[in-house]
Amino acid sequence: MNNTEFYDRLGVSKDASQDEIKKAYRRMSKKYHPDINKETGAEEKYKEVQEAYETLSDTQKRAAYDQYGAAGANGGFGGFDGGGFGGFDGGGFGGFEDIFSSFFGGGGMRNPNAPRQGDDLQYRVNLSFEEAIFGAEKEVSYNRESSCHTCSGSGAKPGTSPVTCQKCHGSGVINVDTQTPLGTMRRQVTCDVCQGSGQEIKEKCPTCHGTGHEKKTHKVSVKIPAGVETGQQIRLTGQGEAGFNGGPYGDLFVIINVLPSQQFERNGSTIYYTLKISFVQAALGDTIDIPTVHGAVEMSIPAGTQTGKTFRLRGKGAPKLRGGGQGDQHVTVNIVTPTKLNDAQKEALHAFAEASGDKMVHPKKKGFFDKVKDALDVD
């Protein structure tokens, strides 16, 4: 995958601003949404758009993607600030102390017997437009590595216990001598018998076969705050995969994906709505019920309103996640020109044009009564 494919999916350039990326995402997401687009391949396109936006809307992931491609955005390279997915600890490459300790058995090597936290997981949850505005509580179900229910995570057959590894004597590491041009180099490596645990399992658990873990379907309730947007994450501590050597469970990161609305668009706490009105309503003015996520609101359209005029409904937008308060709804007017007119409507518009002093390039054709008047020479 080249380093511009995600930009191509959204139809933006590589130097696009976050606002341009967000607008492009809303447009492409609505175009390919399975509930709207029934064409073959639309659902796959929709997923590709989601994947691209998840990366490009995050400044750190975007920087990694621009430099390394998709592998960098997914945490495949070091240098990120921890808390990534798949159990990476933020330091993708070790320091010099790790290099020297690997050759000389120095004290910089991590203790393989130490308790280690389990891997983090991620789960994408879809929210309706309204759920994102008002908040929701969702039950999510996913598979994770859990502590084995038969052996309680020991890996040993019930009634037996692990014993100290005879090869590493419980240290979890062994010394290996290597011949080099500089002489014999000694380095420490993880014990190949106990895999660093320091213990041997003579009789393995029949359920987990000695791993201490088993795949289970796990359910958890997620409280989603009002005002969330696509790409935001909710961290559930201890809901990831089981730890090692008695370590704690990892975390679950719930990634928000807000489905598009049929009538509204949103940017932050501001909601946008396009109001279609007739020429008569625009010219004479009217009072119209405007839909909002909070219910219909009566709004006055002043006489002489032009296409593109925007009105603001204060407090009818989305909640502000930071700082509190409520956003606004912007209502943009779109005057609809009729495409089919009957004779009476045409007569009325011609009369209006004459009264307004408008010169028609193609004057109206005379009607039946006009022809009768001409024949009788009646004014």
Curated annotation (Swiss-Prot):
For this UniProt entry, the molecular function terms from Gene Ontology, in alphabetical order, are: ATP binding; heat shock protein binding; unfolded protein binding; zinc ion binding
In its UniProt record, which GO terms are filed under biological process? chaperone cofactor-dependent protein refolding; DNA replication; protein refolding; response to heat
Residues engaged in binding Zn(2+) 1: C148, C151, C205, C208
Q: Where is the protein situated, by its record's location annotation?
A: Cytoplasm
Task: Show the SMART domains listed in the entry.
Answer: DnaJ
Q: Which UniProt keywords apply?
A: Chaperone, Cytoplasm, DNA replication, Metal-binding, Repeat, Stress response, Zinc, Zinc-finger
Q: Which InterPro entries match?
A: DnaJ (IPR012724), DnaJ_C (IPR002939), DnaJ_domain (IPR001623), DnaJ_domain_CS (IPR018253), HSP40/DnaJ_pept-bd (IPR008971), HSP_DnaJ_Cys-rich_dom (IPR001305), HSP_DnaJ_Cys-rich_dom_sf (IPR036410), J_dom_sf (IPR036869)
Cofactor info, note text? Binds 2 Zn(2+) ions per monomer.
Gene3D superfamilies given in the database record: DnaJ domain, Heat shock protein DnaJ, cysteine-rich domain, Urease metallochaperone UreE, N-terminal domain
Cofactors per UniProt?
Zn(2+)
Annotated zinc fingers (CR-type), start-end: 135-217
Q: Where are the CXXCXGXG motif repeats?
A: 148-155, 165-172, 191-198, 205-212
| Protein family | Belongs to the DnaJ family.
HAMAP family listed in its UniProt record? DnaJ (MF_01152)
Q: What is recorded about the domains?
A: The J domain is necessary and sufficient to stimulate DnaK ATPase activity. Zinc center 1 plays an important role in the autonomous, DnaK-independent chaperone activity of DnaJ. Zinc center 2 is essential for interaction with DnaK and for DnaJ activity.
What protein name does the entry list?
Chaperone protein DnaJ
UniProt source species:
Streptococcus agalactiae serotype III (strain NEM316)
